[in-house]
Amino acid sequence: AASDVYKRQIEIRLKYMIKKAILPVAGLGTRFLPASKSIPKEMVTVVDRPAIEYVVREAVAAGIEQIILVTHSSKASIENYFDRNFELETTLEQKQKWDLLKEITEILPPQVSVVSVRQPQPLGLGHAVLCAKDIVGDEAFAVLLPDVLVKDQAEKNDLALMIERFNVTQAAQIMVEAVPEHLVDQYGIVDVAAAPAEGQSAAMQGIVEKPAVGTAPSNLSVIGRYAVSYTHLRA
C-alpha cells in the first residue's frame, strides 16, 4: 500500500512537470504586411533560418519534448518546415550534400515531437491556448509567443529556469523584461512588490495593460513566455 501511494505521488509530480509547450501561430500577422500576405510571419528569415525555429530551439533547450502549434489553414508551411522531407533528404544523399543533409535533419531533435491543432476563429491568446487542451490534458505546460525572440547565451536559458521554478513551486510563472520608463505604455506591465533579480522570481499582484507613462506599477514588461496549467487558467 505504501508503495502504491509513493507511485501515485511520483505520477502526480511527473504530470505537473512541464514537458509540453504551446506556440500560438494562427495570427494573420497584419503588422508584417505586405510580407505576411504570402509568407507566415513566423517563417520570416532571421539571419539564416525562420524566426520560429529560434523559438522552438529555446523550448527544446529548456527541456520541452512536445511542441504544440495552434495554427490556421494559411500556416501549412510552418507544419511542413518541422516535418521530414524524405524526397529532399534522398536527393541530398545522392548528391553527397552531407552538410545540408545534417542541417535539415537536425532542425528538430529526435526526442521532440511537433503536433498541430487548428484555431477555427481568431479569438485571442486565451482561446488559442484552450484549443490545445485536448492534447495537453491535465498536464502543466509552457506557452511561447513566436513574435518574441529571446536572446540567451547562458548554459541554462531563462525559460529553463522559469520551468524549473514552476516544477518546484507549482506557481504560475511569467517571464518579464525591464523596459525604459517612457516605453511602458507599449507593453503589459506587471505589478510586483519588489523587482526580482535577473534569473530570479517574485510574487506578482497583477498586470496592467499599456499603462500611461508615470502611472505604471513597475517597468517590467511581459515578453510572451508563460508556465501554467489549465487549473491556473480556470482560477
What are these regions (language model features)?
Residues K20-I22, I67-I68, V114-V115, A140-A142, ...:
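Structural motif
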Residues A1-Q9, T231-A235:
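Conserved small/polar residues in nucleotide/adenosyl-binding loops
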Residues A1, M17, G63-I64, G137, ...:
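Short loop/turn motifs at secondary-structure junctions
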Residues L88-T90, E103-A194:
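Conserved beta-loop-beta/alpha segment of the NTase-like Rossmann-fold superfamily
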Residues Y16-L100, V114, E155-N157, L161:
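N-terminal glycine-rich phosphate-binding loop and ensuing alpha1 helix
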Residues E11-R13:
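Residues marking helix boundaries in flexible regions
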Residues A142, A154-L159, I163-N167, A194-R234:
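Catalytic-core segments of class I nucleotidyltransferases/pyrophosphorylases
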